């Protein structure tokens, strides 16, 4: 029997995006047989990565292991100054320098991008898609967006998550 696939839900905040990650986890857990885990990047308390510093960091290695052991991802993060939140960029940098090959945590894995932002989050969604694809991640075409004026469209989210879990089961 094949091992169960694992989706890692990654939140870049302890607020609304963490709540969104928990809600998306609940949808997956209630509709599929895929294993899920939610992590909050804030809890890792990674130091700011600076080129030339020692890359042997136990916390970063633990985070890298989480990424390497996942089959797919759901990233929940807000738009921050028209792009990615710094905590997400910092985490990705640490992952890329603590794996054997800098893309090992990302390549050939599927991902859904989700955002809970004050506005549309479009600048984040576009720039993050580009970064994930560069890292070798296969990003689902449909995103999940929650704004101050629009709550989660549950049926739409269920379809998007179903498509992700369907691809993982192949």
State where each predicted segment sits.
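Glycine-rich phosphate/pyrophosphate-binding loop and the adjoining helix
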Residues: 1-3, 32, 138-170
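N-terminal beta1-alpha1 ligand-phosphate binding loop
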Residues: 2-32
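Cofactor-binding loop segments of dinucleotide-utilizing enzymes, especially the Rossmann-like FAD-
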Residues: 12-14, 41, 116
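Short helix-capping segments at alpha-helix termini
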Residues: 29-34, 104, 136
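Generic structural signal for residues in well-ordered beta-strands
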Residues: 36-38
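A short, structured active-site edge motif that brings together acidic residues
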Residues: 40-43, 105, 109-110, 143-148
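N-terminal beta-loop-helix "entrance" segment that forms/cooperates
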Residues: 41-58
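Helix-loop-strand module that forms the ligand-binding subsite of alpha/beta enzymes
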Residues: 58-135
């Amino acid at each position: 029997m094949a091992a169960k696939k694992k989706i890692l839900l990654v939140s870049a905040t302890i607020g609304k995006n963490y709540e969104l990650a928990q809600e998306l986890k609940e949808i997956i857990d209630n509709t599929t047989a895929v294993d899920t885990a939610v992590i909050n990047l804030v809890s890792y308390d990674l130091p700011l990565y600076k080129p030339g510093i020692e890359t042997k960091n136990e916390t970063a290695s633990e985070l890298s292991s989480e990424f390497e052991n996942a089959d797919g991802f759901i990233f929940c993060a807000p738009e921050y100054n028209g792009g990615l939140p710094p905590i997400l960029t910092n985490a990705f940098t640490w992952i890329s320098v603590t794996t054997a090959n800098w893309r090992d945590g990302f390549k050939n894995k599927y991902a859904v991008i989700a955002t809970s932002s004050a506005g549309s989050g479009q600048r984040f969604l576009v720039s993050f898609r580009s970064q994930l694809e560069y890292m070798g991640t296969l990003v689902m075409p449909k995103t999940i967006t929650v704004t101050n004026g629009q709550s989660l469209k549950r049926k739409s989210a269920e379809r998007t998550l179903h498509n992700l879990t369907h691809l993982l089961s192949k």
